[in-house]
Amino acid sequence: MSTVTFENIFHGDSADLGKLRFNPVGFGWKAYQSEDNNPTTYNGSDIRHATWFRVARHFQLRLGMRNSEKPRISFDGFKRDDLDKIKRTLQEYFNITLETRDTSLKGWNWGEAQVKGSDLVFQVQGKTAFDVPLSQVANSNIAGKYEVALEFNPPSNYKFDPKDLNKRPPDEMVEMRFYIPGKSMKKAGSDAGSGGEETELDEEGNEVSAADAFHSLIKEKADIGAVVGDSIVVFEDCLILTPRGRFSIEVYADSIRLVGKSTDHRVPFTSIHRIFLLPKLDDLHVQLVLGLDPPIRQGATRYPFLVAQWPKDEVVNAELNLTDEELAQYPDLEKTYEATTFQVVSRVLKALTGKKVTPPGSLRNAQGLNGIRANVKAVQGELYFLEKGLIFISKQPILIDFSKTDSISFSRVGGGVASARTFDMRVVSKTGGADHVFSAINKQEVGPISSFLQSKNIRLKNEMEEAIVDIDEPFSDDDEEMESPSEDERPSKAKNDKSKTKPVKKAADDDEDESDDEDFEDESSDGGSPSESDSDDDSGMASDASDPMMEELRKKTQAKRTKAKETSGSGSEDEKPKKKKAKKDDDE
């Protein structure tokens, strides 16, 4: 049996070179690096048509097949001189005529988009600029009034090997947008004459835009809307927080679909790797969180988490569209459900995906609820402590695993009243990644959080001050009199203070009397007695001694008063040198 062989040929999108061999029965391709393996073979009788293209990797032979699973097969790497040889081989062995198709090289981004068979073809002046297999279209959305966005899933058959960079996954296009203005036109009826066109109308009699018609055609041809098999159950009008919108959740045997007014998302069960069921802190709603890998996309935004929300008391009656034989394959499923919506959805997904539903941990906040309120930068959210990690629920949820956490530290930023009531929690990663800082946490949660993390053997660091004096608390007149020493006590008191070493930061109450004496001595260095107003001001400042901001303000105020007294001319000229001398003596 005679054969025809072509060397250095690529099969489809593969980066491996191989050889392509034809014989009267069929043809096959085998990579050079897998000589011991069996080649990929095809039956010659399955070929419907053949096309010759100019592509990036020289020339391409594209074969349309009768097999619905692989409607198109392509081989790249042919030379220009191989055209005649390919024509003779296909004609002789399979009685197939090779069609040569020109490629548009103008580089225009405007033309005509047509659906031909199983391909979306974009033509410029009658020549093909590019074509896209509809089998690779994962989703189609109306991105604007006249825009249609096609999304593509990256190939899942690539395995990344960090030791071999040649086998890394290639760069893939993930989205393509078409701008299609105008209204959709269709051929008019026979009464309007041949060749006439009229505006297409929907069921309600409204005009259909060209973008909507193109979107519907892509969904129909790419089988986006028609998942294989009937849906098992449908949950209508569900509020999805991430990505935000109202969707109907259609559950199938191998995936779920989120169907919205202008956006659809299909999530295979193989993409769901975590399921969380978390009650909100308002005690009125419950959130179902799905961790996705790969994440779903909406425009240029990736969503690695899908967050749905239902009222806590919402009840649903659901009947699964499964036969008794199919139901027997899922022991945890029931034929009918009558319970709260979040319980029914979580139980169905748990049974179909085989994933465990993770509840919140044993930590309770000051109000006895699961979770605490916190901020990440300027984003407010809810932080939940799980048995094996943390999860922060917001527009972009954050999941932290305890096994990858090096330490967690508590700190307080600033010295004002607001910062005294809250603290920050910093999570340091073992892998050297960016730290996660959760701020504006109520200080009442320090104890429960510390106890919970210590039970998980997490290394903790407490960098907060031990005590903070409330600056709003007034001092009584008796306290002012007790804190004001006599003139005879001032010098000896000052000397004793100078002889003492500065202690490490402790509670502000321990240093309050000493700071008052020093302030009084500095302010009364001219030998006079402080006025009544000065005493009142000083006593007020003394109560703020523990606050760094108030301490700085007090020093500035005293400096202004001293400067004002020196420039006012009060006292004789002979007393001024005495001031300096007294100050010098104090310094000594």
Swiss-Prot record:
SUPFAM superfamilies: PH domain-like. Residues 469-486, 509-525 have a biased composition (Acidic residues). Residues 487-500, 573-588 have a biased composition (Basic and acidic residues). One of its GO terms (cellular component) is FACT complex. Keywords: Chromosome, DNA damage, DNA repair, DNA replication, Nucleus, Transcription, Transcription regulation. InterPro entries: PH-like_dom_sf, RTT106/SPT16-like_middle_dom, RTT106/SSRP1_HistChap/FACT, SSRP1-like_PH1, SSRP1/POB3, SSRP1/POB3_N, SSRP1_DD, SSRP1_sf. One of its GO terms (molecular function) is DNA binding. Belongs to the SSRP1 family. This is FACT complex subunit POB3. It comes from Cryptococcus neoformans var. neoformans serotype D (strain JEC21 / ATCC MYA-565).
